[in-house]
């Protein structure tokens, strides 16, 4: 199997290559594993681990930005890159975000983000349910 969500054009291409390779090698692979982590990222993504890591890879590849992830749901740590975090409680997430410049997250996380941060709303049904369903963009195999 291949782990990853094909966000963006470049990451979608990488997943296709990884799938073809996995057919031949019979080895599982996490497609976003080679993304670079930065202690002071330009962007922080809060959300479910695989989708967030995939989006982080896509943004770092297509936009040449440093991106880190905070998984706000319980997840296997092997699905996160070293340096990314798991924070499931609001207080913990808020602490992780205190120095974040740009944050991509479900709109329900906005109240715990620093007031001076640039907040980019990315609704997810696991968090806000159907409230913002009409605002969920389709970024699969699309330029970011």
Please place each PLM-identified region on the residue numbering.
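An N-terminal assembly and electron-transfer interface module characteristic of large anaerobic redox
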Residues: 1-144
């Amino acid at each position: 199997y291949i782990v990853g969500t094909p966000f963006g054009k470049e990451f979608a291409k990488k997943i296709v290559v990884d799938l073809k390779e996995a057919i031949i090698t019979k080895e599982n692979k996490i497609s976003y594993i080679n993304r670079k982590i930065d202690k002071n990222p330009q962007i922080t993504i809060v959300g479910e681990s695989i989708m967030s890591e995939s989006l982080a890879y896509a943004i770092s590849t297509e936009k040449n930005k440093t991106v880190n992830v905070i998984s706000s749901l319980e997840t296997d740590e092997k699905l996160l890159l070293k340096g990314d975090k798991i924070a499931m409680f609001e207080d913990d997430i808020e602490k992780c975000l205190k120095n974040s410049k740009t944050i991509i997250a479900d709109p329900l996380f906005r109240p715990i983000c620093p007031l001076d941060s640039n907040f980019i709303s990315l609704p997810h049904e696991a968090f806000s349910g159907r409230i913002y369903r009409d605002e969920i963009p389709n970024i699969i195999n699309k330029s970011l």
